[in-house]
């Protein structure tokens, strides 16, 4: 099998006005899934594919990741793929959440939500041979949509991974060298997945839409999970809680190993990625209940200290040859103690 993973994130209509400065974790995560079963994928930034630096006819499976705004670019690469290769085209990432996406870009399969276990299942059904599984088999795979003679079939979402399942995954690190400017770019490393903001956006909603039961703000952690009126959780513009659920943290060991290997490859700007960095380890404080409260409990100071101190001791970071920063955080968790920890290890960096 010879799969090609195309990173089209943040490429919009296919032209950028500035050099790529950010390398997300998604493509490396999918590459890690393939590597875990002995398949060596090629990761290609979309700009190189657009310059025709890759002969698509030599690959038998295309995996494209992108955002909703990247639709023109994704459509263009799939159109070219269909002309030059006979293998299936699969799309993932935020763009795959659109129920009409397959009809719009003419891909064969879309993976919605957490894609790692879904991809493994598809590979076991024949995708590893460069063929699309039979329709009867696809109908049983959760977390996908696929094209049929009658249109698009959208299957139910796959249940979210447990923290242990999530922590068992190992993103690829050597494929970072596929990006020409990886030594200068900010390279994202996922430290947790999901979001604790299970408040529902209310605003001026009618009583028929929201009866102001306040369950999502004052109920127990389990009670906040589902809304009686089926309003999606989180910020009104964001799908993270709906797709990925409450936060689940990776172990310090797995994060440390990934960062260490990336530094060894030559990466010099590490960004610890999370919808809210101060959620790291908070899920451990409430297990087995889901972390659906964005304010309580307070940050897990011990977990934050262990993570940041361990990473800061890695030679390139400790010696000032590489930098460590975080992606973002939510203000309602910035207690004085948390601020001191962040200032101790991330001084001079931006959030």
Residue ranges: model-predicted function:
Residues 12-27, 295-302:
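Glycine- and acidic-residue-enriched helix-capping/strand-helix junction motifs
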Residues 40-159:
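Glycine-rich beta-alpha loop elements in corrinoid/cobalamin-binding modules
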Residues 20, 174-241, 256, 263, ...:
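N-terminal pre-triad scaffold of radical SAM enzymes
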Residues 2-18, 61:
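Nucleotide-activated donor-dependent transferases that construct or modify glycoconjugates
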Residues 2-6, 252, 256-351:
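Conserved SAM/AdoMet-binding glycine-rich loop
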Residues 25-41, 315:
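Short helix-loop-beta junction
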């Amino acid at each position: 099998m010879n799969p090609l993973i195309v990173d089209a994130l943040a490429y919009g209509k296919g032209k950028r006005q500035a050099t790529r400065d950010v390398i997300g974790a998604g493509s490396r995560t999918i590459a890690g899934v393939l590597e875990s079963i002995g398949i060596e994928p090629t990761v290609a930034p979309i700009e190189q594919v657009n310059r025709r630096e890759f002969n698509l006819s030599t690959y038998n499976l295309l995996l494209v990741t992108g955002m909703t705004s990247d639709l023109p670019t994704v459509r263009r690469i799939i159109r070219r793929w269909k002309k030059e290769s006979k293998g299936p085209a699969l799309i993932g990432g935020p763009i795959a959440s659109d129920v009409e996406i397959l009809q719009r870009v003419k891909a064969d399969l879309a993976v919605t939500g957490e894609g790692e276990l879904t991809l493994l299942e598809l590979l076991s059904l024949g995708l590893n041979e460069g063929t699309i599984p039979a329709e009867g088999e696809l109908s049983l795979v959760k977390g996908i949509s696929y094209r049929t003679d009658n249109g698009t079939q959208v299957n139910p979402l796959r249940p979210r991974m447990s923290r242990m399942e999530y922590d068992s995954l190992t993103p690829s690190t050597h494929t970072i060298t596929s990006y020409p400017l990886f030594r200068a770019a900010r390279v994202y490393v996922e430290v947790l997945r999901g979001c604790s903001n299970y408040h529902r956006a209310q605003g001026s909603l009618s009583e028929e839409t929201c009866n102001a039961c306040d369950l999502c703000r004052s109920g127990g952690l389990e009670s906040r999970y589902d809304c009686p009126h089926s309003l999606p959780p989180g910020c009104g513009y964001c799908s993270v809680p709906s797709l990925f659920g409450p936060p689940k943290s990776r172990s310090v060991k797995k994060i440390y190993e990934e960062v260490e290997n990336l530094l060894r490859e030559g990466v010099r700007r590490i960004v610890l990625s999370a919808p809210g960095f101060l959620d790291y380890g908070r899920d451990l404080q409430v297990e087995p209940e889901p972390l659906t409260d964005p304010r309580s409990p307070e940050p897990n100071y011990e977990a934050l200290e262990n993570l940041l101190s361990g990473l800061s001791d890695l030679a390139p970071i400790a010696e000032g040859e590489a930098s460590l920063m975080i992606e973002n955080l939510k203000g309602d968790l910035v207690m004085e103690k948390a601020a001191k920890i962040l200032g101790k290890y991330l001084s001079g960096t931006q959030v």
